[in-house]
Amino acid sequence: MSRTMEWAARPEHLGGIPRKLVIAMVGTFAKTVSSFLNTTSVHNADTLLRLVRSRPRRVPLITISNHMSTLDDPAMWGFKGFPIFDTKLARWVLAAEDICFRNALYSYIFRVGKCIPITRGGGIYQEHMNEALERLNDGEWVSICILFQKER
């Protein structure tokens, strides 16, 4: 069984139930972390929410964010007003293959959670970058989290 599990990434997989469960669990975790366990400040949240919810059909959205840990992407879902239970509005994210796709269980969970496996340092001409392009061509949202190091 391939660790990339393209079949698990399809919205119709098992009637969409696994995706709904994973998105709801991650959304609930994010809301708990962002709202109750941390002080969160979001700049221009209204702009992001408008783009996620109201952009014209078939118009893609790309977001790029800096991150410090592997929890940064899911924790971003927790700010006020973010649609944490809507699988259609949830983003696709490029996810490090060596962390998120280490075994069949992780691969399955991350694929139904709309993660695209990427080999860090593999450049732009790698297999799953084409999947990210397909998602964008379908008008979906692709999020890219990059570690931008501060200059010293």
What annotation goes with each model-predicted range?
Residues 39-152:
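Soluble catalytic domains of membrane acyltransferases
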Residues 2-46, 78, 82, 104-113:
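A transmembrane-helix-recognition feature enriched in membrane-embedded lipid enzymes
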